[in-house]
């Protein structure tokens, strides 16, 4: 006969060792990479070339099939390398951090914004690429209204 073990409110296991309770400061990297494969079904087209200077928030590439989906630079710096694979597929874009140029967007009060202005801000800021459409977890389309929104 088997014994059933029921645990309520978790279990406290007294084990030797454990993680240290010290918090350190993370080192800031000098190189950053954008990987188009992080965005499902995105077919990238480059907007910059190697050696170009980019600002934080400047579009680096966009989706060939949906030109309103832009992927922006996470830092300001210089495009160090565009790594390509078979058939010239873009594998990743390496950005070397240099300077602190930031593209700022004028965002008025949320109550004064129209639906079209909100969509335009999402497109220009590159935030649209991170809004997913169910059931296939693809990037949301701006021309289709969602039935519901999950946060």
Regions inferred by a protein language model and the residue ranges of each:
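Mobile cofactor-carrier "swinging-arm" domains
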Residues: 1-15, 80, 85-87, 91-102
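N-terminal, Lys/Arg-enriched amphipathic/low-complexity engagement segments
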Residues: 1-47, 62
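Generic structural motif
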Residues: 38-42, 54-57, 66-81
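Acidic, glycine-anchored pre-beta loop/turn
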Residues: 48-54, 83-86
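Short hydrophobic beta/alpha edge segments that flank linear recognition/processing sites
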Residues: 54-68, 91-99
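Buried, small/hydrophobic-residue-enriched core segments of structured protein domains
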Residues: 85-151
């Amino acid at each position: 006969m088997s014994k059933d073990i029921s645990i309520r409110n978790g279990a406290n296991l007294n084990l030797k060792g454990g993680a240290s309770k010290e918090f350190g400061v993370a080192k800031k990297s000098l190189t950053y990479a954008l990987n188009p494969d992080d965005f499902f079904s995105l077919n990238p087209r480059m907007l910059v070339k190697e050696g170009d200077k980019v600002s934080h928030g400047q579009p680096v590439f966009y989706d060939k099939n949906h030109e309103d989906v832009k992927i922006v630079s996470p830092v300001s710096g210089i495009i160090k390398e565009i790594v390509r694979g078979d058939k010239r597929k873009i594998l990743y874009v390496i950005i070397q951090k240099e300077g602190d140029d930031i593209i700022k967007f004028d965002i008025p009060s949320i109550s004064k914004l129209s639906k079209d202005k909100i969509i335009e801000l999402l497109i220009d800021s590159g935030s649209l690429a991170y809004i997913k459409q169910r059931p296939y977890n693809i990037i949301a389309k701006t021309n289709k209204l969602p039935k519901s929104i999950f946060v």
